[in-house]
């Protein structure tokens, strides 16, 4: 059964329109392709390796992170509410020979049959696109096994993030389509930590990611003032 209460139709439609360019390395999702190796390494290293582990990728879109995790041996389920991105993800997985189970569903509905089922849950660049981030975080917590890891990434809400991710990335550098992000939906680290504290997850680490437009390279940074990730672990 699919649940649609925590879905923003405008957000779904936005990514449906861009779906066909998901795997174009120089297209609208180029930043995600550049960013993905950092995300994958952080997840794999922090979780003590994901080879052979059951992993759920919440808000998987066209499957960039899902595929990379499957390639290093994870057993991956990809979850999204966009039909077009999921079709792109399924087709690309067929073309590359990667085995991934893609499902159209919300995290809340998927939870009903998958409580404490996964070793690792990822929810990357997704929380800022849903009406109720707390609901998604709780669902992720419920689906991971005790002792398992849940990873979140989002964007801080401040003047610097507005300048870099909207004025810079969308309007000046044209790295993203205009309207991709809504600054009001960005989440401060303190706010995300408070949401996590309402669950059985404990924050184990936080790490920022910065982009150099001159070199076109993303790299880790201890500063969480714009893009950042957190690693949480479920209380055993």
From Swiss-Prot:
Binding of S-adenosyl-L-methionine, residues: 39, 59, 80, 124
Enzyme kind, highest EC tier: transferase
CDD domains: AdoMet_MTases (cd02440)
UniProt keyword annotation of Flavoprotein present: no
UniProt cross-references to Pfam families, sorted A to Z: Methyltransf_23
EC code(s) of this entry: 2.1.1.222, 2.1.1.64
Gene Ontology annotations of biological process type: methylation
MF annotations from Gene Ontology: 2-polyprenyl-6-hydroxyphenol methylase activity; 3-demethylubiquinol 3-O-methyltransferase activity; polyprenyldihydroxybenzoate methyltransferase activity
Keywords, sorted A to Z: Methyltransferase, S-adenosyl-L-methionine, Transferase, Ubiquinone biosynthesis
Positions of disulphide bridges: none
UniProt catalytic activity: a 3-demethylubiquinol + S-adenosyl-L-methionine = a ubiquinol + S-adenosyl-L-homocysteine + H(+); a 3-(all-trans-polyprenyl)benzene-1,2-diol + S-adenosyl-L-methionine = a 2-methoxy-6-(all-trans-polyprenyl)phenol + S-adenosyl-L-homocysteine + H(+)
PANTHER family in alphabetical order: METHYLTRANSFERASE, UBIQUINONE BIOSYNTHESIS O-METHYLTRANSFERASE, MITOCHONDRIAL
Family per similarity comment: Belongs to the methyltransferase superfamily. UbiG/COQ3 family.
Function according to Swiss-Prot or TrEMBL: O-methyltransferase that catalyzes the 2 O-methylation steps in the ubiquinone biosynthetic pathway.
Name this protein carries in UniProt: Ubiquinone biosynthesis O-methyltransferase
Organism of this sequence: Shewanella sp. (strain MR-4)
Lineage: Bacteria, Pseudomonadati, Pseudomonadota, Gammaproteobacteria, Alteromonadales
């Amino acid at each position: 059964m699919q649940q649609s209460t925590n879905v923003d139709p405008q957000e779904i439609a936005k990514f449906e329109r861009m779906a066909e360019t998901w795997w174009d390395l120089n297209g609208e999702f180029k930043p995600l392709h550049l960013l993905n190796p950092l995300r994958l390494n952080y997840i794999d290293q922090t979780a003590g390796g994901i080879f052979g582990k059951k992993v759920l990728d919440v808000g998987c879109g066209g499957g960039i992170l899902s595929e990379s995790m499957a390639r290093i041996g994870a057993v991956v389920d990809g979850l999204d509410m966009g039909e077009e991105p999921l079709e792109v993800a399924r087709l690309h997985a067929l073309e590359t020979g990667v085995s991934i189970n893609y499902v159209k569903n919300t995290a809340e509905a998927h939870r009903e049959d998958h409580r404490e089922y996964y070793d690792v849950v990822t929810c990357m660049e997704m929380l800022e696109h849903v009406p109720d981030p707390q609901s998604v975080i709780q669902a992720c917590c419920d689906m991971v096994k005790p002792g398992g890891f849940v990873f979140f990434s989002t964007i801080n809400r401040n003047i610097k993030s507005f300048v870099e991710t909207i004025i810079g990335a969308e309007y000046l550098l044209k790295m993203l389509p205009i309207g991709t992000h809504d600054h009001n939906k960005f989440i401060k680290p303190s706010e995300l930590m408070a949401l996590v504290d309402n669950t059985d997850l404990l924050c184990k680490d936080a790490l920022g990611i910065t982009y150099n437009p001159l070199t076109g390279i993303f790299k880790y940074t201890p500063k969480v003032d714009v893009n950042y990730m957190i690693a949480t672990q479920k209380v055993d």
